Amino acid sequence: VKHKGITLKRIALLLFVVILSYLFIQSKNILDIAAGVAIFLFGMLSLEEGFRAFAGGFLEKVLQKTTNTLPKSIGFGIITTTLMQSSSLVSVISISFLSAGLISLYQGIGIILGANIGTTTGAWLVAGFGLKVDIATYAMPMLVFGTLFIFQSNKKLKGIGYVLAGLGFLFLGIAYMKDGFEAFKNSIDLREYAISGYKGLFIFMFIGIFATVVMQSSHATLVLIITALGAHQITYENALALAIGSNVGTTITAILGSLSSGLEGKKLAGAHVIFNVATGIFAVIFIYQFKEIVEYSAEFLGIAKDDFTLKLALFHTYFNIIGVILTVPLLSYMIKLLNTIFKSKTIQKDEVDDVLFLNDTALDFADTAVNVLHKEAIHLYNNVFTIISKGLSVYKEDITSGMEVEDI
């Protein structure tokens, strides 16, 4: 079954490469847009690599100190996602710490809620800055200095280099997407394929989900949506549906990240799915009410009537914040539901040698790795103790009770 799964993945990849190659031959504009997405995703990988360089103690200490209450957990999720521009990395860190027992499920869910709000900063960055200036000019010096720092032997300088290079690639990717859609206007108008009403809402929402699953990044999908909207290649209403879809589609990344984690990590991924799907459904049901709120807010904030990119960023912010506000009072019920769905396996007497705490996710960061190794060492000690006591036909409780050897 596993072999068949790998074969299907390879066939799908080959088919995807063939289709893309054909599209690139047919249109240089599609090549520019695809290159922009690829550069943007590479920038996100560089950013993640850079922040991982600071995860050898500092990030872990900050996480433990700033997540002891729900508001702090949400705040941590917002700030770290804003800095890293990757809710996926924040999710991975949260799952790792939860799997190692360094934070509770309650705290982990708080971080995920904050990360969802934090993703909106990417939309504001692109809509408010990326489309208004020649962002590529800022990218070049970042790439030069970033590369210079990457080749240094000092780990922290190398980390700074990856962060600078990552930001440079993000900006360069946005510029390529922007230019690609601008050039598209002269050859084809994608608005001809716009669909209005709830039919269009559902169709474009599923397109947003699919795009996010393919790119494994809601940030990249959102940037693509905003650049297309800025070039007047999609309608505002369809862009809102795509944004909702990108929010729902990002849960796939959380699910994939939890596959190698422990039970608690799977619970956190489940919470992520429940929140994003429920928020998406809520946004779809009240889409027109959200649009009215955005219009009033845009007028109050001085946003131009035809500045739909900023309105999209405002919409994305509103439906994520309202989703968090509605979720917080129901957290205890959500945790009960997750505990019911993900039940711990009962350890049988003949399974004393099973690994309990070690998992790939917890080994991603230094502090979590040390913690799970310590717990696993204690578990191994208990296993050995049990095996030896059974071999000697004595009870473990008697050995630890302080009884004399003769009495045992």
Predicted regions and their residues:
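Transmembrane alpha-helical segments and their short flanking loops
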Residues: G130, I174, K185-G197, L259-L363
